[in-house]
A protein has these predicted regions:
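Active-site mouth loops of central-metabolism enzymes
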Residues: 1-3, 174
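Conserved active-site-proximal phosphate/metal-binding subdomains
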Residues: 33-55, 61-204
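Glycine/Thr-rich beta-alpha phosphate-binding loop at enzyme active sites
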Residues: 3-44, 86, 90-91
Length: 204
């Protein structure tokens, strides 16, 4: 199984012999593709390109989003942010709380000169954004701003201002810490509820 941000890379991975493709859209937390293709656009494109099963990722945290991904041709979904914020997650409580308190637009893509990465806005993000907006920042300068183990500082050690807080846009839909079981049951139940609602629609 290989994660891809584009149909072009999906085709290369299939040719190399992978058994399935995870197609991750621009909404995903952490490292992203340079193409910045959203999940809504990426999934159909990848499904039309490859014959192996496609697993949708990026911005999926609810049953409605899961059903939408399946409707576009995905045979499954990969859910990251919703489970990263679960009670059982090894992420720090401070990280979980900061992500839960955030809303729409609270995460941004940055570090495009290194590897495009979606982060929660904080003091570290502001320093990165300021350097990038200067127009002449080097990769080495960006690495210096990040410092060593930036994601470890933010996610696991709870430094919510000077650490790298990697989380997806779907964190905006999460308003409390649930167990993994509660999260899974909620997603599956909502997916089935919306599936039945769609089946009840009368076509002209």
């Amino acid at each position: 199984v290989h994660v891809v941000p584009s149909s072009k890379l999906a085709a290369k991975c299939e040719a190399a012999g992978v058994h399935a493709i995870v197609a991750a859209g621009f909404e995903a937390g952490g490292h992203n593709g340079k193409e910045e293709t959203t999940t809504l656009s990426l999934i159909p494109a990848v499904c039309d390109t490859v014959t192996v099963p496609v697993i949708a990722a990026g911005g999926i945290a609810t049953g409605r989003q899961m059903l939408a991904a399946m409707a576009m041709g995905a045979e499954g979904v990969q859910i990251g942010s919703a489970f990263a914020l679960c009670a059982e997650s090894s992420a720090s409580d401070a990280f979980k709380q900061r992500c839960i308190e955030g809303g729409e637009g609270d995460t941004m893509l940055c570090l495009k000169a290194l590897s495009p990465t979606r982060l929660v806005r904080n003091a570290l993000y502001d320093r990165i954004a300021e350097a990038e907006q200067s127009g002449n920042v080097t990769k080495e300068q960006l690495r210096e701003i990040l410092g060593p183990a930036a994601s470890k500082r933010g996610i696991f050690e709870g430094d919510i201002e000077n650490g790298e807080l990697e989380i997806g846009q779907s964190a905006a839909y999460i308003n409390k810490v649930l167990t993994a079981e509660e999260t899974m049951r909620s997603i599956v139940a909502e997916c089935e509820e919306r599936r039945k609602a769609l089946l009840s629609w009368a076509l002209p």
